[in-house]
Amino acid sequence: MHHKTGRKLSLVGWSLGGVFALYGAHQLPECVRSVITLGSPISVDPEGSASPPLVKAMYRLIAHPMGPHAHSMQPRASKLRGRATLPMPLSCLYSISDGIVPPQEATVEGDPDLHENIRVPGSHIGLGFNAVVLWIVADRLSQPEGHWRRFEPSGPLGHAYRMLTHRLQAGQHGRNNCRPNRR
């Protein structure tokens, strides 16, 4: 697309797709405008992953159909994290109730002027269909190139988002997050 239009691309990746997006951005930074990851294991230490054993086995299982070198993508993305940071905006969306990718593996440290971690509600499988996630992705993609700003929602939606993430931070997440508190 970049070669056809001359415009930079925004890469959005969900789960392992975020690992591929991050890797692509490192390989061709001149073609990439921004990267958005959704519950992606971008900070995994393959030797001591906090992922459950079943999830580790799943990564190994799905790596084979992707090709002989697919298993190396996750460690490479993790190593890339320690090198020079991406020269473009990076928004990492993660959930404390993901169930597949632990929050510490779906977030990144980097340049606070270009990189951010955004907590969202929901499960790993639901991230691609979650209205809050889609709203945030649309917000990130709507920013003009060269004028990136951190996600700081305002208005009624911003208030609702802050209330929701405050509940998550307070530990009121998981299966009961849609039920009223009963005391």
List each model region and its residues:
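Serine-dependent carboxylesterase/thioesterase catalytic core
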Residues: 1-84, 100
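C-terminal catalytic-base region of ester-bond hydrolases, centering on the histidine
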Residues: 86-183
